[in-house]
Structure formats: structure tokens, C-alpha cells
């Protein structure tokens, strides 16, 4: 029953509005007119309609504007001295260039704002059983019926002014909502650009960190190779000194026998050669070093 009454009240509202409009146009100059009555279907009127689509004015980032910026940042390497056979000092620098491109764009969409609705009427029903076959029913409720007010106070002209004021309020609200949406969009675009720039700087820092780690590993391997070469040279020097000392302290002996048969007879020549070495050296800590070497003595025996 309530839905059927609501449909009937809605049809009465539309028919009465049409009759009021036709009466106002057909009887211009006369004193009689048809009163417009508005019956609400939900017990309370709605202000400004159910929903409104608010247009947002375009901003500075409504189109794609690509930015291009060349960032040059170089690093200087410390001077290093590598002793191979001749001291060599190398000075170097690395120039690294990053090309940053980017843009910020906002795809605008219509802002849909729901209009407030006046609360539905409140009804309460209390059924009391008093005993002895007696009963009492109490009904209480609150409602706002705009049609009663219009029957008493509003004519067609006043209702038209009321509708014009409602539309003006709606347009002003749409304009204010569009300006607030544009301001919020600018804040979002500014924050998005800031986040993008922070991530771009992080990209450059990541490259520099990777380069630094690789250089540290190369330097460590170079120091390991130098240390290994140093110990290899030390071992080779020890072997060379041991071989030299063995040669210097070695002893050798050779026996020589010569026998010649000739027409005049037999000639025999015998001999022996013995070689020995004894090295002695004295080292003093100071500006000079004195080394004494005992030369090899050779003995030859002839028989």
C-alpha cells in the first residue's frame, strides 16, 4: 500500500506541475491561476536532486609535457703507485652522465557528488495490554510535509523563485567543488613529481655504490696479487742465495794423466787440481758496508 501511495503522489506531483505551468502561460493578465502542489513520496523532500556531476576545470598537467635533463656527475680516483720495475703513478677520473626523462600527467574525470537527503520520517507504535480486555495503542511520529507548507504559503511565482535559488545553490556548490578538486589535483601532481625525483636520485646513488664496491674488490685482488708476488720473490731470493752459497762453498778436485807414445819413447805427465772456496763477510749497520772475500787458491802437482 505504501509503494502504491508513493506512486500516486509522484504522479500527482508531475500532473499538478504541468497544470500549473499551462495555467500560468494561458491566462496571462488574469487574476486566476492554478496552485501548484508538491507531494513528497518518501515523507521528506530531497534538495538538489539525487546526484550531480561536477565538471573540473583542466589544469597545467592535462597534457603530456616530457622533460629532459642531463645530469653530469664525475668522480676522481686517488693516485696509486704500482712498483713493478719502475715506479708508475696513475691519475685518473671517471665522468658518468645520466639522462633523466619524465613527465607528469593527470587523466581528469568527472567528480560525482551525492546531494544530501532529508531524513525519512520516524514512526513508533506502542501496543499496551491493560488487562481485563482493555487495550491501548499509542502512535507517535515526526515528519516534514512540504506540501502543507506550499498549500499555505507558496504560489507559482514563489515556487519558481524557490527552484531558481535551489539551482543557484547547486551551481555554486559545483563551482566550489571543482575548484577544491583542482587544488587537490595540483597537490597530488606535486607529490608525484617529488617521489619520482627521489627515486631518480636513488638510481644514481645505486650506480655509484655498485661502482665503488667493484673498485674495492679490484683493489683487494690487486693487493693480494702484490702480496703473493712479494712472497714469491722472497722465496726465489732465498733459493738464489742458497745456490750461490753452495757454489761459493763447493770443493772440486780433478786428476790429470797424460801418456804420449812417440818414436823417441813414452812420455807420461800426471797432475791433480783441487779447488776450494771459503766465504767470509762482515756487515756493519751504518753508512758503509765492508765485505771481505777470500779468493780461490789453486794447487797443481806435477809428477
Curated annotation (Swiss-Prot):
Q: Where, per UniProt, does this protein localize?
A: Cytoplasm
Q: Source organism's superkingdom?
A: Eukaryota
Q: What is its main location?
A: cytoplasm
Q: Where is this region: CAHS motif 1?
A: 184-202
Q: GO cellular component terms?
A: cytoplasm
List the residue ranges of the region (Disordered): 1-67, 270-303
Please give the coiled-coil regions recorded for this protein.
170-257
Q: Biased-composition ranges for Polar residues?
A: 270-280
Skewed-composition ranges (Basic and acidic residues): 294-303
UniProt keywords (A-Z) are: Coiled coil, Cytoplasm, Repeat, Stress response
Q: Where is the composition biased (Low complexity)?
A: 1-19, 282-291
* UniProt-annotated stretches for the region CAHS motif 2: 221-239
Main role?
CAHS proteins are cytosolic heat soluble proteins that seem to contribute to the anhydrobiosis in tardigrades, but their specific mechanisms are yet to be identified. It is possible that protection during anhydrobiosis might occur via the stabilization of vitrifying small molecules such as sugars, but not via the direct glass transition of CAHS proteins themselves.
Q: Which family is it part of? A: Belongs to the Cytosolic-abundant heat soluble protein (CAHS) family.
Tell what the record comments on domains. CAHS proteins contain 2 repeats of 19-mer peptides designated as CAHS-motifs that comprise each two octapeptides connected by a tripeptide.
- What's the protein name? Cytosolic-abundant heat soluble protein 3
Show the taxonomic lineage.
Eukaryota, Metazoa, Ecdysozoa, Tardigrada, Eutardigrada
Amino acid at each position: 500500500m505504501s509503494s502504491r501511495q508513493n506512486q500516486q503522489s509522484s504522479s500527482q506531483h508531475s500532473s499538478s506541475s504541468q497544470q500549473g505551468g499551462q495555467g500560468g502561460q494561458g491566462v496571462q493578465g488574469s487574476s486566476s491561476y492554478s496552485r501548484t502542489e508538491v507531494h513528497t513520496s518518501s515523507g521528506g523532500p530531497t534538495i538538489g536532486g539525487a546526484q550531480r556531476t561536477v565538471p573540473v576545470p583542466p589544469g597545467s598537467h592535462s597534457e603530456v609535457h616530457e622533460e629532459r635533463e642531463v645530469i653530469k656527475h664525475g668522480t676522481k680516483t686517488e693516485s696509486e703507485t704500482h712498483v713493478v720495475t719502475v715506479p708508475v703513478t696513475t691519475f685518473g677520473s671517471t665522468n658518468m652522465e645520466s639522462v633523466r626523462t619524465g613527465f607528469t600527467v593527470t587523466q581528469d574525470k568527472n567528480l560525482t557528488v551525492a546531494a544530501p537527503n532529508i531524513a525519512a520520517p520516524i514512526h513508533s507504535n506502542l501496543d499496551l495490554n491493560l488487562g481485563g480486555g482493555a487495550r491501548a495503542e499509542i502512535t507517535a511520529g515526526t515528519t516534514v510535509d512540504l506540501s502543507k507548507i506550499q498549500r499555505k504559503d507558496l504560489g507559482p511565482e514563489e515556487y519558481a523563485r524557490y527552484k531558481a535559488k535551489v539551482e543557484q545553490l547547486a551551481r555554486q556548490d559545483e563551482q566550489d567543488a571543482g575548484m577544491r578538486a583542482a587544488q587537490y589535483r595540483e597537490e597530488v601532481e606535486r607529490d608525484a613529481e617529488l617521489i619520482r625525483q627521489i627515486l631518480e636520485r636513488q638510481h644514481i646513488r645505486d650506480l655509484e655504490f655498485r661502482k665503488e664496491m667493484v673498485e674495492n674488490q679490484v683493489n683487494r685482488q690487486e693487493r693480494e696479487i702484490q702480496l703473493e708476488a712479494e712472497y714469491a720473490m722472497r722465496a726465489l731470493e732465498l733459493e738464489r742465495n742458497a745456490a750461490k752459497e753452495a757454489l761459493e762453498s763447493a770443493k772440486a778436485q780433478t786428476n790429470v794423466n797424460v801418456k804420449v807414445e812417440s818414436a823417441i819413447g813414452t812420455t807420461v805427465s800426471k797432475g791433480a787440481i783441487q779447488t776450494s772456496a771459503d766465504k767470509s763477510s762482515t756487515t756493519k749497520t751504518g753508512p758503509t758496508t765492508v765485505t771481505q772475500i777470500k779468493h780461490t787458491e789453486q794447487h797443481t802437482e806435477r809428477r
